[in-house]
């Protein structure tokens, strides 16, 4: 078929091809970084999982395009099915190439504040985090009233927005509103890899580039707020953000302490293989088996002695450049945290399959459990995003509206400002 470069036309074509089961043709539209992270097989699994719930496609709606940002246009295409619907969300560049593709709930599922958020108890304002061409937008949430509140900077994993939007859920917005309701000022921001996605696959890019400059800038922005105690600004990281948090604190001595939510410690290539195998076991079949085998091959290359700065990013896990993986080899989050003279709160979900008690938390415990200023707690019913549930955790669970467990918000708030 003739390739159109108009983002809306591209989005419609992709939905039509997907609905027709022509997944290999959709993969041909993927940018190298997307192709490294997904495949025709993974698209087939995701699509068939959704259609099993919603029934066959009955109609494809009009694409809705957002204003261009960092050279990409985000397009949402509503799809009506026999027993419901879904939204196909894509990021398209000006040549018609796909840089992002996900299946989301119908757009009519708005985020609702959790019961523990009390909007009349805080204010919010927009900020710019960082300077120069890689500056990003953010939000600072400050409790009302007179006080020198503790502050908390939130760090997400992956190319996330400031709310860590996942389906209809916004776990970082849950945290910001819930904590601000309890007397904690919070700064959150769009990741540089979200606003400037081209950075994530650029040669030379590392975890330091992904996290440290903007995290340090956010810490200093919070310290400048007149209602915030500059000596009590902490950093919270979830998943990869939890892994990176000790590195941020090492770079910025004024950080008062760390909160790690499901911070991973197992070498990431091995974790990626574990997750791929878990997903293949949840939904056995040729496509999931092929996806797990592909991840295993990429992980083996990442961990091999043959990995070099010139190894193409498209051959590596997540489409990250070799520089990222070579830098990770020299970074030990537990040892870095242990060298910090700062208090820490480590929380882990018992149902988390992405970061686990057995493979990840055990390393934090071995390195830090004997320290009196370190608190470690497992929320047995929580998944990776700290949503409560029962039974095995699955990616599909993130597409149902949920909120961060109120017990997690209480743990963090009480640790930052112990009840008197």
Regions found by a protein language model. Give the residues of each.
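Catalytic active-site module of serine/aspartate enzymes centered on a nucleophile-bearing elbow/loop
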Residues: 382-386, 390-420
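Alpha/beta-hydrolase active-site loop
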Residues: 204-225
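Conserved alpha/beta-hydrolase "acid-adjacent" motif
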Residues: 353-360
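Cap/lid segment of the alpha/beta-hydrolase catalytic domain
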Residues: 154-210, 387-398
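Accessory cap/linker subdomain of secreted extracellular hydrolases
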Residues: 251, 257-339
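Short solvent-exposed beta->alpha transition segments
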Residues: 9, 24-70
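N-terminal cap/lid segment of alpha/beta-hydrolase-fold proteins
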Residues: 108-146
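Short beta-strand/loop motif that positions the catalytic acidic residue
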Residues: 340, 346-348
